[in-house]
Amino acid sequence: MFSLQKKALQHIYMTPENASELSKDLLQHLGLYWNGPIIKMDTVVHLHNKIFSNRSVLKYALAKQANITIIETLVLWVEPEYALAQALKHNRKDVLECIFSYHLTTPKYHHIMHLTSSQELFEFFHLFICKSKNYHARMECLLYAATLYNFQNILEKNREYIIRHSIGNPLFAIACKERHINLIAWFVTAGVLDTYDDSTLFNTAFKLGDYSLLEVACDLPITYPDYLIISMMQTAIQKNYFRFFKKLLTHFSIYRPIIITDAAYYDRRKILLLLLNQNIFNNFTILCALSAAIKGHASKKTLNLLINRLDSQMTVIDSVYYSIIKYNNIDCIPLLMHIKTFRMETLISIAVHGDNIDIIAACKAFLPKDTLYHLVLKMAIILRNHKLFKLYTEKEHPMYIFTILKAIISDFINYTVFQALAIEYLCKFHQEKQLPIVPLLMVLAEHNYITKFKKTCYAANMSDQKVKRALIKCLFIATQKNYCQIFKYCFGSLLKVLSKHEQEKFFNSVVFAKKLASYYDHQNMIQLIDSLIERFRYLLKA
């Protein structure tokens, strides 16, 4: 509440006698030669038929360092906050004292404290606006304000207090947030921090995107652990802060595979180029980066950049193939084919294993049909992927698939388990499609599957001339490969179904088979043929 005297001062009339107290400069600025009163009317001053705002008159009076008596009157004509702000700007302690003497219940005006450049005035002003009766609360409030508004000399003056009461860390956090570079350096070097967290300054620099903060962090006399710098590099890559990354790389010279891998994954081509130009990373690391780029669906330019840096003889690692399939990155396949050691067969094998139909379909553009089907069906058999086998066989010509399966069975010549599995698939497919029996007999004889051979013969029409000719061919195959059981079964089966005339020709074939066995030096087969001829000679003579 204003006293009556203060209320009267707010509506003061300045007579010509008082005018002498106004500075000559102020009167001239107002365009007056004094001959009348100054009259305050609400928010304006009426002076010799001219109107000026109360604020402009006060501002000019302070700038011209007018008499305190005049200013004491003018400050009552404006809002307290404006009067305080102007007094702070002009570093007028006497004006502040005047205002505070009038306004005993001053609100908190912390937000205008920064308007002064004087440490003394800053502390004096804070003394009045901080209403806490507790000394420590007032001190902490002052130090927080000094940090907020960058008054380093106040902090230096109260260094011991900061250390004693352990408030260095929260003050340091404020300095980082407000980007007061000089304060940041002071906090770190003045020994006022309880426990300095190395990441605080870096994290703040990245959060605010402030390069100058990062420079301060790098230039501080602190030995940072490698893991922290690597973490900051990864953050720079994620945020695509090239300047930040370059500063960290050149200042600390830390090169780790995880850095180039992250750059590839996030498709940061400028950072990748910077790293690759150092000629530090080996082929294996670049391949890992390539795998990460595929995983992150990086651009073609990024993939080409990595591929061109690889040694042409470097074997492509499995993680590259797995990345293509797992993350379904079809677009990278034609680019990878420029690598000499890239194998489509390996890719298809892994794709079949992962049941990735899209990748298999995409490979059609890069492989001949026969090769693709051979690889797909081969892997489908190995993995017993019935669904994929059916998908790639149901729409094709049965004999085309049969031919491919024959080739696959031959591929498994040294893998008995897989060959037996392939034979199972072949027999089942043959039965489903009702194919001619002859080709199946030939395959079974060639690979010595006697049990299935017998079953197939049992199901065949043995009086059919094609079947008879097939059995004779199987006889020669058995002779050549020394398959005694197949030979014996073919011999017995043919004797049962051949006519007298056919038996004579058959005997000539058996004699030729013996010569063939002698050529290959299959003694067991020679003995078998001799015993069979001796045993069934009576039939042949008859």
From Swiss-Prot:
Induction: Expressed in the early phase of the viral replicative cycle. It holds the Pfam family DUF249. Keywords: Early protein. The keyword Cell membrane does not apply. Transmembrane segments: none annotated. Plays a role in virus cell tropism, and may be required for efficient virus replication in macrophages. Belongs to the asfivirus MGF 505 family. This is Protein MGF 505-11L.
